[in-house]
């Protein structure tokens, strides 16, 4: 196990969520499931693109919120589309600026690497146009960021 591992509290869906996340990420695997006397999953562990996670079925006392999100750094628009569409499916929700909530209530930021590249340029006016364009988006669209950067 890595030194720091996100630990996710679920009501009863830890195993279901783990299997879902493993299906969404191409480089992912189940690491283990520990079961209680009733045979139901108590804790789960899995890996998404080299990042280990643990999950716990512990009841409805705590819910996920926007204070903690999983940041997915995407190579291109196709990858943004893949993660966005998969994570909002079956009851997930879109939010602004590349944020979305999956059907288990976990928050994600689906961000193309181009956003940082375009915002980090040496021309503050161009960077501000990119920021202003992004602030109007739900899912981030790379082509629209580029248009804003170019002043179109």
Predicted feature locations:
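Terminal peptide-recognition signature
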Residues: 6, 21, 46, 87, ...
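Short, solvent-exposed beta-strand edge segments and adjacent coil->beta transition regions
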Residues: 1-5, 65-69
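Core segments of cupin and vicinal oxygen chelate
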Residues: 8-51
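Vicinal oxygen chelate
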Residues: 14-15, 63, 70-115, 121, ...
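Active-site-proximal beta-strands of protease catalytic cores
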Residues: 29-31, 52-54, 106-114
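Acidic/histidine-enriched, glycine/proline-rich intrinsically disordered or flexible terminal extensions
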Residues: 126-152
């Amino acid at each position: 196990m890595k030194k720091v591992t996100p630990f996710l509290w679920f009501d009863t869906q830890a195993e279901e969520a783990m299997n879902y996340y493993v299906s969404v990420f191409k480089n992912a695997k189940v690491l283990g499931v520990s079961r209680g006397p009733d045979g139901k999953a108590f804790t789960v562990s899995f890996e998404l693109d080299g990042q280990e996670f643990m999950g716990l079925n512990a009841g409805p006392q705590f819910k996920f919120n926007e204070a903690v999100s999983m940041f997915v750094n995407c190579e291109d628009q196709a990858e943004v589309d893949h993660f966005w569409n998969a994570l909002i499916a079956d009851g997930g929700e879109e939010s602004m600026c590349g944020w979305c909530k999956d059907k288990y209530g976990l928050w994600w930021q689906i961000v193309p690497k181009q956003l940082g590249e375009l915002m980090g340029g040496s021309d503050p006016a161009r960077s501000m146009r990119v920021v202003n364009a992004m602030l109007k988006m739900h899912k981030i669209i790379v082509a629209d960021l580029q248009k804003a950067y170019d002043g179109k």
